[in-house]
Amino acid sequence: MVLIMPNFNTQTEHPELDTGIAVAKVFQANQVETELVFAHEFPNLRTKLKQAQVPFFPWWNVFDAIQAVPFKMGVPMVLKDVPLEPGVEPFMDVNDAYYYREGRLVKHVHLLERYIVQFITYYDENGERITDYYDDRGFVTFRAWLNSAGELEKKSWLTPAGQPVLTALANQKVIVEPKHQKRFKSAVYHNIDEVVQEKIREHIQTLEAKPAMILEENDVHLHDVLDNLAPELQKAIILMADENHQQDAMALPHDDLELVFTSDAARNAYFGTSEPTSNSHVISPYPARLELGASNEMANMNIVLQLADGLSPNDTTTLAQTLAQMLIADENKVMYACIDGLSPDQVTCHLRVVEAFTKEIGITYNDADYKIFESTMERSMMSSEADVMDYLDQQYEKEDREPISDEKQAQIIAAYQLRQRFVVLDTPSMEKQLGLIKQARVFVDLRRVPDAQLQAQALSTGLPQITVGANTFVTQGVNGFVLADPMELPQALTYFTDDLKHWNEALVENVRQVEQHSEFNLITAWEGLMNYGH
């Protein structure tokens, strides 16, 4: 048995992108007995599992065990089920309903998708309030009491019938209700985490054999699980983040701890100049599946580009000038540049590309005539650049303004066309990036640690890949390049974009590697890691 603890919660917008879920899907497809374990309150768990595309995957939630919830499915509470008391007037505002009595707010209902009840807050005359949080199976899962200052006074977890099981006080101490005492080892706990660990341990002990447990490095429960449950586990496996490591995983307390990285680049970045330890492994959570996109059309010259980070200012400027010159030299190329708006390096690179455009063409994007032209183009989607210029000539003449010279008209049109072929996407969603790759000809990731999921999608789509960080899927010079220097990008790109023979060779290699990185081969790697069959 494998227990997987995903790292998404009630607020996660895209649980389908969770690494633990990706691994669970591989296990499910290969009949590995697996269960998702959730160690935190999760009133909308069924909703999130549906979003994650695993609605019927076996799961266990510790709070169901705590609250004695005997069923997995149910019908959510909806707005029409909320009673309307006499003398109370409701007001709707998209996902919120406010109820007033004689001008005083007495109840607030917060909704999901305009009709599913998430919580109801009741207000008394003194400003104190009680909030009932609803499970998406239709019952109140916990109740919170707050004073007029908004401070939590106590919180109770309830059975589906509405009986309190546990009550947490303002000092975090948790008291077990007498009626439920026999299900717990203590009448009082220091905090709710102690109860959670007790119930997870009990659940593990009901299994026929010690399970392997897979957790994500940045899961807030990681230390608690390893501190308290290590003796109950056959093996603990940590899915390491690609970047932004929150802790030193090597210091985690477990004798049989394994670290799994999504790529060689991620592992190398984590260990730096040190030799990777024997308990560190590279297994992609994303299987490759052959699904060729539009990239096999020679006319399609879309390049999906992840801009670089960690470059010196001089190198950033040089790279930007290189990208600009490539686009200026080949009017068929289109670059979709994905940047993290919080990365100064990537934002700077974007700005330097624009500066290089203006320097080459001789006009800035802040030029008054250019801005008028661009805004007119946006309003006239079906018109050509020449048509819009003719229109502006007429408008300028009517307004007795100095006409735009032929030379400047050419500069404006050239600047506009370049801007249309260098499309900057600020912090695009993973879904958006995966969609772009399916329509691209080459995938370029200039970041120090490339994204494993994007790499797997590029392989599945048949694209050549060009990266700076190590790439498990690249056979150097055949289906891609791992660059020693980002400045080598122009030669690497033209190798695939300007020579159909090279592009076809890359496609053949990608098809071969899709089999190599299939679900079957991934599960073989996982089984080897967990010592199955020994």
Residue ranges and their predicted role:
Residues 419-429:
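Active-site donor-binding acidic/aromatic loop of nucleotide-activated sugar
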Residues 501-531:
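A charged, aromatic-enriched C-terminal amphipathic alpha-helix characteristic of glycosyltransferases
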Residues 429-440:
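Short acidic alpha-helix that forms the nucleotide-activated donor recognition element
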Residues 75-194, 198:
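Repetitive, compositionally biased segments used for assembly/scaffolding
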Residues 253-279:
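A short, active-site helix/loop in glycosyltransferases that binds the activated sugar's phosphate group
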Residues 447-508, 512:
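Catalytic binding pocket for nucleotide-activated donors in carbohydrate/polymer assembly enzymes
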Residues 1-83:
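N-terminal subdomain of nucleotide-sugar transferases
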Residues 288-404:
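Conserved catalytic-core segment of nucleotide-activated headgroup transferases in glycan assembly
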